[in-house]
């Protein structure tokens, strides 16, 4: 496995032939990232993983400086996953000066995470576009935990005519149901226990959707509480999307009232547009959930079919 910045990448890339897969990361890798690398290996002859903590996607009050950078551990995980080249550029290589030209995420980048973190997705898409240009992959693999990011990258690939196949991997969860995230390392034990309200909310919503339509995306791996049953009484009615959303909120709101978390958003949206699902909606949808627990910003989601 080779490791290097832009010049090393260009030399390595010029010597290679075959299908190249890319897994973009910000480091602090866990088994969810390794699952992305394993999938990229299955789809490609060569795998590149990028490790770059991108300052453009952090807000002024966010944790860019404190963001974990365990590079030696990350390299070991990349090697275990069969990565061929780790692209780990210095900040000055990627941004010799403050970029004047950036990718603008548009309407879909200004809602939900984009509303909570203004400019976040402009920064994400800018660095992803740079990675696509530098690495020239044939396929790229993203996790679906950051589902809004996935939707925007998919749209950018189409709008900017990148000839790249995009693959999304389902959310990888710990045994307790919490979605794997590098930010989970910030959670104190008591906060992690409180954060389990998020997968419980998704499971409650999934139960209501299943009762209302008979089909739904898989749950979040943790037992749903009684709120799903309470909210489910209206699940078979005309406005199933509203009942699904209400079931999730019925799990989250009591925790918020107890001061265990702060709800940032909990909304059911059309998967293709990220617009709210209207009454009687049919088609693929996403339940998007975000909460702040002990000062840590967490996101999760549930795909559903109506």
Which stretches of residues belong to each language-model region?
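Structural motif
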Residues: 46, 284-286
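A structural signal for short secondary-structure junctions
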Residues: 259, 280-283
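A conserved acidic, glycine/proline-rich C-terminal tail/linker
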Residues: 264-281, 288
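Generic C-terminus detector
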Residues: 286-306
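Nucleotidyltransferase catalytic core that binds NTPs
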Residues: 1-219, 226-261, 269, 273, ...
């Amino acid at each position: 496995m080779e490791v290097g910045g832009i010049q090393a990448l260009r030399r390595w890339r010029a010597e290679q032939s075959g299908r190249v897969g890319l897994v973009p990361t910000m480091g602090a890798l866990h088994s969810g990232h390794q699952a992305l690398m394993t999938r990229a290996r299955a789809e490609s002859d060569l795998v590149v993983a990028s490790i770059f903590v991108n300052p453009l996607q952090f807000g002024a009050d966010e944790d860019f400086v404190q963001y974990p950078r365990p590079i030696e551990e990350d390299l070991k995980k990349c090697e275990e996953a069969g990565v061929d080249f780790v692209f780990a550029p210095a900040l000055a290589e990627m941004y010799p000066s403050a970029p004047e030209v950036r990718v603008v995420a548009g309407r879909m980048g200004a809602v939900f995470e984009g509303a909570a973190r203004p400019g976040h997705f402009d920064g994400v898409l800018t660095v992803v576009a740079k990675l696509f240009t530098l690495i020239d992959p044939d396929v790229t693999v993203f996790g679906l935990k950051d589902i809004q990011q996935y939707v925007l990258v998919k749209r950018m690939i189409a709008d900017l005519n990148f000839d790249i196949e995009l693959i999304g991997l389902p959310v990888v969860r710990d045994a307790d149901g919490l979605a794997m995230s590098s930010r989970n390392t910030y959670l104190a034990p008591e906060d992690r226990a409180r954060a389990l309200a998020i997968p419980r909310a998704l499971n409650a919503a999934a139960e209501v959707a299943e009762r209302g339509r008979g089909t739904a995306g898989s749950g979040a791996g943790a037992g749903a509480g009684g709120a799903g049953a309470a909210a489910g009484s209206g699940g078979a009615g005309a406005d199933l999307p509203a009942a699904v959303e209400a079931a999730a909120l019925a799990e989250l709101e009591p925790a918020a009232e107890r001061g265990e978390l702060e709800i940032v958003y909990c909304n059911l949206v059309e998967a293709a547009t990220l617009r709210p699902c209207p009454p009687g909606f049919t088609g693929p949808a996403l339940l998007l959930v975000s909460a702040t627990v002990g000062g840590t910003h967490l996101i999760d989601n549930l795909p559903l079919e109506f």
